[in-house]
């Protein structure tokens, strides 16, 4: 397979530990996996071997790319069945999982998923809004799965709770090739107040120590 040059070395994919009720979710996960392999991009993900997590991690691993899973000890018996895929880092808390995924990745993509996927997605969006990172965040909007969320965010913009600049943190597309192209072209934009904020050490914003990002 011919490789396509990418600005990213590793992309973190948030997705469900379930497979969903439509074959289109399965197909989208495989298409994204194949696009990562084609572009010579490694995978960071939640560490499970079930649902969409297991599907995309196995496909990327089979394609010869490195797979790094981050999973809390308490979830391992539930989300890992049989042999683990690729490299797995075990952490103590959900917060540490998100921090390590954020530290390891150059960009983020959310496939369809449940509460855990939503929470991971919204946290990295918030980190971007606060200037903690400048990494692209994309929604793989399979069959309009995220249409309602995007409408909800647009409502928050209209009502004055989210700035129009912060709205542009998120990019979305219905398929993996289009989404990855948008991520490649992404240019960070922040509200003026962000440039006035000083974090203790933004280069080490994502750590596993204490309660820091």
Swiss-Prot record:
Q: How does activity depend on pH?
A: Optimum pH is 6.5.
Catalytic function, reaction form: N(6)-(dimethylallyl)adenosine 5'-phosphate + H2O = N(6)-dimethylallyladenine + D-ribose 5-phosphate; 9-ribosyl-trans-zeatin 5'-phosphate + H2O = trans-zeatin + D-ribose 5-phosphate
Biological process terms from the Gene Ontology for this record are: cytokinin biosynthetic process
Q: Does the keyword Nucleus apply?
A: yes
Pfam families for the chain: Lysine_decarbox
UniProt keyword Nucleus, yes or no: yes
Record-stated family? Belongs to the LOG family.
Q: What does this protein do?
A: Cytokinin-activating enzyme working in the direct activation pathway. Phosphoribohydrolase that converts inactive cytokinin nucleotides to the biologically active free-base forms.
Query: What is this protein called in UniProt?
Result: Cytokinin riboside 5'-monophosphate phosphoribohydrolase LOG2
Species source reads Arabidopsis thaliana
Instruction: Report the gene name.
Output: LOG2
């Amino acid at each position: 397979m011919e490789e396509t040059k990418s600005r990213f070395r590793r992309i973190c994919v948030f997705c469900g530990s379930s497979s969903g009720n439509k074959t289109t979710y399965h197909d989208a996960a495989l298409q994204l996996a194949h696009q990562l392999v084609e572009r010579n991009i490694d995978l960071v993900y939640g560490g499970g071997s079930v649902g969409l997590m297991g599907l995309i991690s196995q496909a990327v691993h089979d394609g010869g790319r490195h797979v790094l899973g981050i999973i809390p000890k308490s979830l391992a018996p539930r989300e890992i069945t049989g042999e683990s895929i690729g490299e797995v880092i075990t952490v103590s808390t959900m917060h540490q999982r998100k921090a390590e995924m954020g530290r390891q990745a150059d960009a983020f993509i959310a496939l369809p998923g449940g509460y855990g996927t939503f929470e991971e997605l919204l946290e990295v969006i918030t980190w971007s809004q606060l200037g903690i990172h400048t990494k692209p965040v994309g929604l793989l909007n399979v069959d309009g799965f995220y249409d309602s969320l995007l409408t909800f965010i647009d409502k928050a913009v209209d009502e004055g709770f989210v700035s129009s600049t912060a709205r542009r943190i998120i990019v979305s597309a219905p398929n993996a090739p289009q989404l990855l192209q948008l991520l490649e072209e992404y240019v960070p934009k922040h509200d003026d107040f962000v440039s006035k904020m000083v974090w203790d050490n933004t280069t080490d914003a994502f750590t596993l120590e204490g309660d820091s990002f």
